[in-house]
């Protein structure tokens, strides 16, 4: 039974709490009851995987307490019961390939887990789950005569998504990263985009960016085909160059993107790629954290001594930004645990 404080109005993220609570575990029988409890406090709002940290705190604390009483290794217990590919989640679907087992194994092998503790220190282990979704998304990519690209997206950057989308566009076009500029456009400029929430931005807008870049590449190939007087299907795009293929391979000198865009005013006008979609499904992620905390036995003050994050990142588009998200999430979790009621 979960009870979440909703504040003065209903709306606590009970659905997500129930989805996340037992997601890391292979359990044949699960029954969850959730209550959205009204209280004399301000209305709640979504914040950092709404509902998931509360669920993890409840379930993972119980698992650690159980392991402590039975003298069991907390990671071994989690490994024995971990969700893996083919496991049916407590809320219905079967998992595809997921990385929870790998996270647990990496955590157990990490030097932190076997490091000695001193008097007044304790060690906690926790696994957690979150997911993202698609939502309505539209992206436009316009090429300039100087060979640069202007990417317009409708999702505000709250986690480094602009840098990631610049990377994806640059990779598809075959041009340097600094040749792509991303602008956050409004609804009047671009069309409707769902808001930046639910960890959806790089997932959905990133996919749309790739598709918009490929749309632009298709048009670049058409311009090259026009120059060479061959079929569009006989042109491929490789490393930022239009190249003849098939029977025409080697017959013409490859044309770089900047040369094609420089002449686009004379070969058909602006080259703009566009894509809009509502991606379905969800990308899921699991993590395991190890924390050493120390309590001052005279004052009762607690502070974190050591913190290790192991997470299944999937494809880390911008690794340093992904690491920053790990650090930020850990810092916010520490804040919740030690500084907030």
Model regions and ranges:
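Gly/Pro-rich active-site capping loops and adjacent beta-alpha segments
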Residues: 1-55, 117-341
